[in-house]
Amino acid sequence: MKFFVLVLLLVLQFFSNKALSQSEEGEFGFNGYLYDNSGIAITNSKGLMKLTNSSEFSYGHVFYNSPVRFKNSPNGTVSSFSTTFVFAIVSNVNALDGHGLAFVISPTKGLPYSSSSQYLGLFNLTNNGDPSNHIVAVEFDTFQNQEFDDMDNNHVGIDINSLSSEKASTAGYYEDDDGTFKNIRLINQKPIQAWIEYDSSRRQLNVTIHPIHLPKPKIPLLSLTKDLSPYLFDSMYVGFTSATGRLRSSHYILGWTFKLNGTASNIDISRLPKLPRDSRSTSVKKILAISLSLTSLAILVFLTISYMLFLKRKKLMEVLEDWEVQFGPHRFAYKDLYIATKGFRNSELLGKGGFGKVYKGTLSTSNMDIAVKKVSHDSRQGMREFVAEIATIGRLRHPNLVRLLGYCRRKGELYLVYDCMPKGSLDKFLYHQPEQSLDWSQRFKIIKDVASGLCYLHHQWVQVIIHRDIKPANVLLDDSMNGKLGDFGLAKLCEHGFDPQTSNVAGTFGYISPELSRTGKASTSSDVFAFGILMLEITCGRRPVLPRASSPSEMVLTDWVLDCWEDDILQVVDERVKQDDKYLEEQVALVLKLGLFCSHPVAAVRPSMSSVIQFLDGVAQLPNNLFDIVKARENVGAIEGFGEAAESLAEPCSVATLTFTEPFVSHGR
């Protein structure tokens, strides 16, 4: 991937001795033009400093040309300092979140080993968190990165040698009258003023931001008590850094002042340069109008001819390779699927996800209702192995697995054919059809159904099948509301007693176990983790992660349920379930606790699916110290004390095996 690096170094416009004296005095600034003999060079004639352009994965640096003497001796104390600047972050992609900028104090003029994207041009994968960096920064971040424990996609943080902030807060300010907190959106067309002030005597670093038309608030947004002396050298460079990733933003500095041992001069807002106008909408309209007026007739003729040729010659074309002969009974003709789905019309669309669209249809030869998942698979390498696995999975027979009937391969597209489930997915009943709510008995039955199907995949077939994408959207319901696990598009096979090979991390956010995200190695235990999340989701009636939850404690489902266990675990139950007077509180509590058990972050602690079925059937009881085991997720080292219990719970149980010999299908790899 091609990276674009934009580095702007502020150069001196006057003599070097004059600039040196000013840096030693520790005061400089610009306000949209050169003044006070600061010698700062601007980036354009209007005084607007732009850190990044419209390139993807780029970063920009702007540094004052001369170092600032923060200490009088190597072992001395860092002097007090104050700086204020006006900045703006403008999205280039319809206000989508990109990446932010940072004010930085660095031992070098420029950060030669920095990276773009989430690293903000400050650090890279290797040196992030290295104590030898000697970098102090204040980030204005517009992207939430889980690896740095970011609270949201609109926050301000104080960073020392690492992008995991010492202290952070959602961007905003406190009103002077009553202390009310007001949010500020960092990405917009309106400039924002920031103040960063360090009191050497109190060893306190304060950060304040506010709209430029308002005075500086009395209460800072962030206040960190920390001696900066160990982190800063005698002389350091000050400046700004910003970065873009796949989503691009433009970063501007409109004005900036800095002072040692005093308060930085305020910026004259009336003399700031103007931000460039967003001309994208106007330009697009003009281009469209001209293009349509000149080429509408030609395009119409071209599309008509192309459509007719496509219908007549190529729409039903497919290639059958020699190696597919052995899978013949599992292969459908594209023509049959095309007719069954009425040409894959949108009116026949059942749903779509990250791995393909699903259409309903009826086979004309047998009048059988089917579901067809259309999957893009444009890599020829591995296609034969993939089709072989599909044919193998097609031989599965279990009442709680959706039948995979076969496949069709055409050019770079793959079609998986399943039994059609008339009631649709569990996801629809949990979130999209409030008028058709499920009572507790139905929910508990679905949980047991999915557990039975998953246990069959893990323990009762001739090979181990790891599903890798367990979630409500992949649990389908028949006319009797029986739950069936479907969509084997990501499934992996391995022999009993052997570990599966490492592959790309696949699945759905919120259901991926910690060890899978680290190692890329899926296992039956990672399936158990996802099943635990599914149990909690069915019981609580909410998604695994709610970025806009009413309180931080409710953002992550597992954390919320665990917190409530200490008080009353039943308070997390879906209100629609509570309306049913017949629901069994003891049964609900069992499912919630078992869900936390299965979703434990340490794989060795999780039970096997055989054990899960015994817990659900009441054949076995949950451990008496389960709360301590689950609570230990907050301190991974604490689980060592439960090692023997974890190993015994992970042993598979004896469950009757269901054996069938007819062919089988599902929707989607």
UniProtKB/Swiss-Prot annotation:
GO cellular component annotations of the record: plasma membrane
A GO molecular function held by the record: protein serine/threonine kinase activity
Enzyme Commission number(s) of this protein: 2.7.11.1
Subcellular location: Cell membrane
Alphabetical list of SUPFAM superfamilies matching this protein: Concanavalin A-like lectins/glucanases (SSF49899), Protein kinase-like (PK-like) (SSF56112)
UniProt membrane topology term: Single-pass type I membrane protein
Active-site feature positions: 469 (proton acceptor)
Coiled-coil ranges (or none): none
Family: In the C-terminal section; belongs to the protein kinase superfamily. Ser/Thr protein kinase family. In the N-terminal section; belongs to the leguminous lectin family.
UniProt protein name: L-type lectin-domain containing receptor kinase V.9
Gene behind this protein: LECRK59
